[in-house]
Regions:
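VWA/integrin I-like adhesion module and closely mimicked acidic/polar interface patches used
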Residues: 38-41, 196-250
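Hydrophobic beta-strand segments of well-ordered beta-sheets in folded domains
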Residues: 59-65, 95-100, 187-189, 226-240, ...
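Extracytoplasmic/luminal low-complexity segments enriched in Pro/Gly and acidic/polar residues
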Residues: 230-278
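DG-centered beta-turn motif at the end of beta-strands
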Residues: 67-69, 172, 186-198
Length: 278
């Protein structure tokens, strides 16, 4: 009599539920991989100082704006200056420091009205790894608004009998361009002024002498205000002073003097542009 073979047990079929679970598992793995890719491939944002908003290891760039109001500025000129300053605020790269300064006549130096880094406005941040909305709010409240307020204050009239532009630039070079943190940073200085240096050590008014750099080198101001701009680019926004409709100084020779002065102090002359209305 033939022996009965035991019936083979069939493995349970995967079924739709099992297939769905497998797909969900694969989707989770893929999503996790994508998130990890974004997290590790996105450049890490630097740690910022709570007060200055600059990276704790120093700003990536430094932009200083020196506004000279030792003489009144025409309304048209003021409007153009405000427009240019607003452009600087809104286009400053992230993690660059913006320092807005005016002449400190009494102290024979400069005075800072605002000095902070752009912390970034949230543009380009990932929703996965950052919070663009909070970054935007911080940029507005901690950077944009106070910088705009300082910008308006910088053009307030402060008429004076002297104009220590060289001393102010020397002060800026010591404060902003000489530190180890600023050594490798891109450095730019904008000077908004008629550029007429007038102190007891040296004056550029016609009654004091010509605009030659040689005359300046023979004055006490040459050694007193000699400085190191550490390769900073200096850009002049030139205000033309007039008497009876005629320029007070020869603008071409005047700008040439300042080009020589900047280069003699280890800076880069970035050009001069005449402002409207003056």
């Amino acid at each position: 009599m033939a022996r009965l073979r035991p019936r083979q047990r069939k493995e349970p079929a995967l079924g739709w539920a099992g297939l769905g679970g497998l797909l969900l598992l694969l989707l989770a793995i893929a999503s996790g991989g994508a998130l990890a890719y974004f997290y590790f491939s996105t450049p890490a944002r630097p740690v910022l100082d709570a007060q200055t908003l600059c990276p704790v290891n120093g700003p990536q760039g430094i932009t200083v704006v020196l506004v000279d109001t030792s003489d009144d500025l025409p309304e048209t000129t003021q409007r153009e200056i405000l427009g240019q300053l607003d452009d600087m605020i809104t286009t400053l790269p992230p993690f660059y420091r913006l320092d807005i300064r005016v002449l400190d006549i009494a102290g024979v130096r400069s005075r800072s009205l605002f000095s902070k880094c752009n912390p970034g406005d949230g543009e380009g941040l990932s929703e996965w790894t950052d919070n663009p909305r909070i970054a935007r709010l911080r940029w507005i409240e901690d950077f944009r608004k106070p910088a705009a307020l300082a910008m308006k204050s910088s053009i307030a009239a402060a008429k004076a009998n002297s104009s220590p532009i060289m001393a102010a630039i020397q002060d800026i070079a010591i404060d902003q361009f000489s530190s180890a943190a600023g050594k490798d940073a891109k450095k730019t200085l904008y000077v908004i002024s008629d550029m007429i240096e007038h102190t007891r050590n040296y004056s550029q008014y016609a009654r004091a002498g010509d605009l030659s750099f040689q005359r300046y080198k023979q004055s006490p101001a040459y050694l007193k205000f000699r400085t190191d701009l550490h390769g900073a680019t200096v850009i002049i926004r030139y205000v033309t002073r007039q008497v009876n409709g005629q320029p007070l100084l020869d603008g071409t020779k005047h700008v040439e003097f300042w080009k020589d002065w900047i280069e003699d102090n280890r800076g880069i002359f970035g050009g001069a542009k005449r402002l409207q209305g003056a």
